[in-house]
Amino acid sequence: YAVINRMAEDNVVLAQYGYGRTDGADGRVWPWVFNAASHYWSQIAVKMKFMAEKEGGIDKMKGKKIVHLHIDSAYGREPLPAMRKIASDWGVKLVEISIPPPGLEQQSQWLQIRKERPDWVTFWGAGSGMNSTAMTNAARVAFPRDRMMYVTFGAAEEDMYPAGDAAKGTYAVANALPGDDYPLVAAIKEQVYGSGKGNLADESRVGTVYWNRGLGAAVMWIEALKNAQEMHGKVGKAVTGAEFRDGYEALNMTEDRLEEIGIKGMVAPFSISCANHEGAGKFAVMQWDGDKFVQVTGWEEPLDPAFIRKLVEDSAAKFAKENNITPKSCG
């Protein structure tokens, strides 16, 4: 959020791997910003789709109550534009409850939740301390963890372990699934860590959520760089910021390419274009069983991806108008 407006001036790609300002996915207004793979508005739409499936359909969501419990920051409020619109369309009562940073004091918020008696809680926390504190507080007020859905940045093993038994049953979404049996992960484990060249003090973290997410991001950067070198006749040579951006917009991570790299299934297939910098727009739902995350859905997209895209374009257009930005022509 703090540096997004500097990218064009500095000619530097801002790779928001599933985080940051959502309307950065409109490459016409934000040509240097990439949300790939998938942004927060698609994420909240996938979560609400999952809730509807659990409740028996969208028609059963009318009259339901969802609390959006979040850290009081731009990040915590990021999903609200899409969430408010979906809630209004479905007849859902949305209750917004904020937590002052750093988020370790949550008792009053959970007492409010006990009073509200919501059907679901979406949790947008920051840091394992805040994230685990929410689960222990939920347990104290007897709010079921299988009615809580965590943001991607609260969806790691490090967020669950500190809460102990209180974490069991919690749902979370992923843009990169954990596991060390993906061929690339297994190869790194064998060839890098097996030869003593790894930099993790605890090698058991290889294949965890955050580690695999970092691997997914690294793969994307390397593929974008290779694209840039090939497109501009610079194979084996350094590229400029603008050329690297071109490489990003040429990303086409098909199932076949992901399999060739060795991460098929770990991330959703996606492609990028001049106008669309989001990528897959898909997330997988996981549930913590007390020891590990168990995948409970495949790669899910919002019920209406075009609706989410329209929200993105409208928000980006508003920003462009307010800041005298002429959107890039993508042909």
Regions found by a protein language model. Give the residues of each.
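Sec-exported extracytoplasmic/periplasmic mature domains
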Residues: 4-12, 52-56, 84-92, 114-118, ...
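Extracellular/periplasmic catalytic domains that process cell-envelope and extracellular macromolecules
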Residues: 7-10, 27-28, 60-62, 114-116, ...
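Venus flytrap/periplasmic-binding-protein-like
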Residues: 14-16, 20-25, 102, 144-163, ...
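Extracellular/periplasmic Venus flytrap/periplasmic-binding protein
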Residues: 22-23, 31-143, 148, 179, ...
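Extracellular/periplasmic periplasmic-binding protein-like sensory domains
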Residues: 30, 34, 137-218, 301-302, ...
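Segments of small-molecule ligand-sensing domains
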Residues: 199-211, 222-297, 325-326
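Short, cationic low-complexity segments
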Residues: 299-328
